[in-house]
């Protein structure tokens, strides 16, 4: 039975020194099957792309595998080799507040973002498949239907099925519990000694990635609506105020190609759905438009709820177009951040990320920049809460409607 991967360093502690790469690769070359040679050569290439520890561990396992199959059967290819050959990482996932959220075209989540990051690190496409429960998802790994799983299954369940797990907190459970996330969230692999699992362990437990994981957890904070006051206040607004404006939200969401509940979440974050709201900075109405933005959107009366909702919807659509090069699902977070602090502020962050050699179209990178510079820029703090809160309100409404 495979043992769970708990910590990267602990996992390698018991390994003995394997044969040299040249010896291991010479075993591959001796096969007479041409098609199998090609597969094994691709495995060898994949080995060379791994960190030194992962490479030696992988070779150690291959050199000592007496039952290694030199036919074209499924056992002839490691999970890592299959992923690289397909250029796609297929993941079985169970919906949850710590794994992924997928309703009405919105697909995001703490585990989802980390899994997407791992796929990007491999240079492949992520193919996420939704399963009803942990056992079904783990069975998909067990029977080779998927490459790995994203669940909050217990270690006992994973061990009993002969699988290996990698905790996404990399042993730092307090990081997740602080933000209301389940510390059991993990990746599960069929074989802990496979290069796919070893590469994942190296990726998620890298010192820089551990810090990034904490920032992603901060964005997916689940504590907002677990607070009784916040939950009751939000529910009351949906019950008592929303019916007065629901048709306007729906009409203008259709007009400008939005999800209407996203507009409601924005309206609640902006004004608690108060049509007469006025802030000390001069923004007004349900969607809290500035005077200049209102004029640009054709709004003559900012406290008129219909005009305000239409103006907010129109402005959000313009912002989505402004960040058209940002792929979904990140584009909506970019647009919301721009709605809060202006598109030029977001583009300035993108420019800085480019200078740092980072992906400027990644929301995780933008959010990390906001978090890293929050102490020196109060607008960044406000923006972080703004986008994260809207995400929470949106998820709550979607879950209620399911």
What are these regions (language model features)?
Residues 150-165, 347-348, 352-357:
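A ligand-binding cleft/hinge motif common to bilobed small-molecule-binding domains
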Residues 58-153:
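Extracytoplasmic small-molecule ligand-binding "clamshell" domains
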Residues 258-274, 309-313, 335-340, 390:
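Short, functionally critical alpha-helical segments immediately adjacent to catalytic or ligand/cofactor-binding
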Residues 93-95, 162-201, 230, 369-372, ...:
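Periplasmic-binding protein-like
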Residues 54, 224-273, 306, 323:
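Export/targeting segments at the very N-terminus of extracytoplasmic proteins
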Residues 58-74, 109-121, 181-222, 243, ...:
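Extended ligand-binding regions for polar small-molecule ligands
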Residues 335-401:
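Catalytic and substrate-binding regions of cell-wall glycan-acting enzymes that process beta-1,4-linked
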Residues 276-300, 307-318, 361-367, 390:
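Substrate-binding/active-site groove segments that recognize
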């Amino acid at each position: 039975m495979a043992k769970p991967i708990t910590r990267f360093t602990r996992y390698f502690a018991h390994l003995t020194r394997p044969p040299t790469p040249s010896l291991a690769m010479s075993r591959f070359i001796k096969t007479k099957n041409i098609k199998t040679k090609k597969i094994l050569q691709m495995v060898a290439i994949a080995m060379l792309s791994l960190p030194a520890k992962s490479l030696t561990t992988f070779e150690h396992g291959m050199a000592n595998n007496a039952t290694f199959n030199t036919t074209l059967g499924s056992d002839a290819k490691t999970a890592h080799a299959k992923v690289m050959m397909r250029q796609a990482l297929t993941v079985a996932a169970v919906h949850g507040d710590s794994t992924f959220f997928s309703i009405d075209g919105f697909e995001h989540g703490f585990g989802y973002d980390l899994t997407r990051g791992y796929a990007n690190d491999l240079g492949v496409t992520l193919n996420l498949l939704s399963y009803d429960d942990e056992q079904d998802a783990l069975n998909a790994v067990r029977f080779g239907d998927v490459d790995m799983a994203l669940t909050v299954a217990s270690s006992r369940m994973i061990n009993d099925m002969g699988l290996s797990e990698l905790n996404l907190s990399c042993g730092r459970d307090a990081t997740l519990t602080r933000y209301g996330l389940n510390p059991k969230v993990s990746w599960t692999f069929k074989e802990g000694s496979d290069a796919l699992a070893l590469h994942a362990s190296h990726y998620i437990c890298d010192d820089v990635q551990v810090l990034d994981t904490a920032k992603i957890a901060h964005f997916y904070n689940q504590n907002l609506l677990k607070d009784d006051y916040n939950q009751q206040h939000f529910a009351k607004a949906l019950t008592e105020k929303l019916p007065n404006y629901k048709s306007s939200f729906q009409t203008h969401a259709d007009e400008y190609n939005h999800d209407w509940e996203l507009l409601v979440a924005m309206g609640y974050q902006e004004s608690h759905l108060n049509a007469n709201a006025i802030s000390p900075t001069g923004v007004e109405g349900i969607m809290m438009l500035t005077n200049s933005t209102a004029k640009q959107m054709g709004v003559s009366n900012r406290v008129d709820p219909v005009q305000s909702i239409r103006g907010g919807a129109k402005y959000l659509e313009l912002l989505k177009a402004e960040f058209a090069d940002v792929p979904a699902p990140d584009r909506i977070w970019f647009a919301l951040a721009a709605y809060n602090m202006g598109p030029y502020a977001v583009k300035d962050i993108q420019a800085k990320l480019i200078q740092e050699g980072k992906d400027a179209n990644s929301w995780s990178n933008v959010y990390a920049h906001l978090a890293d510079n929050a102490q020196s820029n109060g607008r960044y703090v406000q923006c972080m809460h703004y986008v994260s809160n809207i995400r929470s309100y949106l998820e709550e409404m979607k879950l209620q409607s399911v």
